[in-house]
UniProtKB/Swiss-Prot annotation:
Cellular component GO terms held in the UniProt record: extracellular space
The protein's name in its UniProt record: Kunitz-type serine protease inhibitor isoform 5
Organism: Bungarus flaviceps flaviceps
Signal sequence annotation: 1-24
Disulfide cysteine pairs (residue numbers): 31-81, 40-64, 56-77
General remark: Negative results: does not inhibit vasopressin V2 receptor (V2R/AVPR2).
Sequence similarity: Belongs to the venom Kunitz-type family.
Tissue note: Expressed by the venom gland.
A Pfam family matched in the record: Kunitz_BPTI
Domain BPTI/Kunitz inhibitor: 31-81
Lineage, uppermost ranks: Eukaryota, Metazoa, Chordata, Craniata, Vertebrata
Amino acid sequence: MSSGGLLLLLGLLTLWAELTPVSSKDRPKYCNLPPEPGPCHGRKFAFYYHPASNKCKEFVYGGCGGNDNNFKTKDKCQRACSG
């Protein structure tokens, strides 16, 4: 296979991996945790995965602590948890 063909194959595999949704079986366990604002008193908007609706939702994060179901952007939440 030529180097151009290998690059095309690599590009297609990368695209497939990015666009393939995470199945609930393969979803990280932290995606099922409830939103946890943490002990600090800041007011930062963050996103958490809501398994019942299969959507990422916004919540107010205190700025420290909490759990791993906490993402700076909706896009990062969806990539990690949406199936």
